[in-house]
Amino acid sequence: MGISVDNIVKKIQSTDQKYNYDEIFFDWIKSMFYAYANTCNTEGYEDREKEFNRLIEKHGAKTMQMFYECHAELVILFEEKGIDDYLGKIHHQLGVHNKMKGQFFTPFHLAKMMAETQVDGVIKKLEEGKIKITDQACGSGCLLLGLLAVLKEKGINYQKNVLIVCSDLDENAIQMAYIQLTLAGVAAKCENKNALTEEIFGSWFTLGTLLF
């Protein structure tokens, strides 16, 4: 079977039924998040290491191997099929979207359509120099990814000219956004934040900030 969202979903569904799909999915997210965040964020490094080791103890070698395989497939999807909200799609296909919190993940084709209406203005600003793009309720990063995809299609090198500052109150959502913005190669600061009170619970830079 080729590399695809469906393949990742099936791998997650094939795990032992000791835990629900939502718990398995978000533990996979955490395993990737801890690994990426620890490459370029010193604050909280040891805590993330401890949490990663806790995941190993919780799930064991078989499930952790599945996590590694799914992670590798996600990387390949970004490299070979381009930018997309892959984690949002996997999240939806597993049926673990959180209706109780009123969460809604925008379909990626709509995110790109919205980006198309704004991209000319973004490109004009880029002609003047580096720019910052903000999203205070970013979810899995779908709208931001849509804009990056459109910029890339138009031949714009956003990696050295665009800084994203995004946040979400939901810790799982911002971790999804952080992973995908990392894989998209963009400079980003991602915050677990209450946009109303301005309280910040965590803040992390992506690897792309090293090039910005």
Predicted regions: what they are:
Residues L210-F212:
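Terminal (typically C-terminal) long, contiguous, charged/leucine-rich segments with helical propensity
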Residues G2-G155:
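Class I S-adenosyl-L-methionine
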